[in-house]
Design a protein with these regions (language model features):
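Sec-dependent N-terminal signal peptides
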Residues: 4-18
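Non-cytosolic coordination micro-motifs
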Residues: 21-65, 87-188
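Compositionally biased P/S/T/G-rich terminal and signal peptide-adjacent segments
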Residues: 60-84
């Protein structure tokens, strides 16, 4: 029953044409890579949303008017007056423990793998975050043009022995240009 629910949720979250061959064929909350953020929110709203910068890009956090996810992190180039979306991360808070996040991730991973045989999959394993005992476990799927899908669970523990049962599931779509910028930032 849980598997059916996850598949239904994934299908509601994502629009996938039967011949999807690049990241622009996907939607999260009706938004795709290559769309203008201005099609969904006003410039005044963008200015009100929390944001930060990553290299040549700005990221804006949207937490209002969402149907499925708790928040969206939308990435676009700093000096782009059209606000063309290069990255899109959907976040779901998980309050029932990291193992439930891993179950959700596993189900979605199987669904992505069954939809696409031509993507290059990589499980990065459990990686450490900046805070002690906090980790994340990303799995990436790369298209031939280097666009990327990433799913990940973030375990936001308080200490080695104390979990706060507040974890995060992330589903990301990234253009190849944004993936390259992330790689450059990681080297620096």
């Amino acid at each position: 029953m849980k598997k059916i629910l996850v598949i239904i949720v994934l299908n509601l979250c994502l629009t996938i044409p039967s011949q999807a061959d690049n990241i622009r064929d996907f939607e999260i909350e009706g938004i795709s890579i290559g769309d203008s953020l201005l099609e969904f929110v006003t410039l005044a709203e963008i200015d009100k949303f929390p944001r930060n910068e990553v290299g040549k890009y700005k990221r804006t956090l949207i937490q209002t008017n969402l149907e499925i996810y708790d928040s969206l992190l939308v990435t676009y180039k700093k000096n782009d007056n059209k606000y063309i979306i290069e990255g899109l991360t959907a976040n779901i808070r998980i309050y029932s423990g990291i193992n439930n996040c891993y179950k959700k991730m596993s189900s979605i991973e199987k669904e992505i793998s069954s939809l696409f045989s031509n993507l290059t999959r990589k499980n990065w394993g459990i990686l450490e975050l900046d805070k002690p005992y906090q980790t994340y476990n990303p799995i990436t799927y790369d298209f031939e043009n280097k666009d990327r899908i990433q799913i990940a669970c973030w375990d936001l523990r308080i200490s080695k022995d104390k979990d706060n049962d507040r974890d995060l599931f992330k589903f990301s779509l990234m253009s190849s240009a944004y993936v390259n910028e992330i790689k450059l930032q990681a080297v620096e």
